UniProtKB/Swiss-Prot annotation:
Lineage start: Bacteria, Pseudomonadati, Pseudomonadota, Gammaproteobacteria, Enterobacterales
Gene Ontology molecular function: amino-acid betaine transmembrane transporter activity; antiporter activity; choline transmembrane transporter activity; spermidine transmembrane transporter activity
Binding partners and assembly: Forms a complex with MdtJ.
Record family assignment: Belongs to the drug/metabolite transporter (DMT) superfamily. Small multidrug resistance (SMR) (TC 2.A.7.1) family. MdtI subfamily.
UniProt cross-references to HAMAP family, sorted A to Z: MdtI
Compartments it resides in: Cell inner membrane
Protein name: Spermidine export protein MdtI
Transmembrane segments: 6-26, 36-56, 64-84, 88-108
Gene Ontology terms: biological process: glycine betaine transport
Organism: Shigella dysenteriae serotype 1 (strain Sd197)
Amino acid sequence: MAQFEWVHAAWLALAIVLEIVANVFLKFSDGFRRKIFGLLSQAAVLAAFSALSQAVKGIDLSVAYALWGGFGIAATLAAGWILFGQRLNRKGWIGLVLLLAGMIMVKLT
């Protein structure tokens, strides 16, 4: 793997933001009944994978994918809480803690 460069971290951050945007648009699409939000969600997913493909040029795939997925899930949970009033139950919180612990373990290995 190439030496770490901040540009790859920036690509990863962009991929995470685009994943969150895609998930929010998907919720707004109401099961694709509101087609414009469905199409925007698909475009954001494509853009997220494109950004992720640039990130893995300088970050190990396993690390980049774990961070992308983990931060994407955690931030999507926050967006669901802020925008839609969605709450996690106790099992959901335990799952989130395990997810974050897993991300840390992958990064440390």
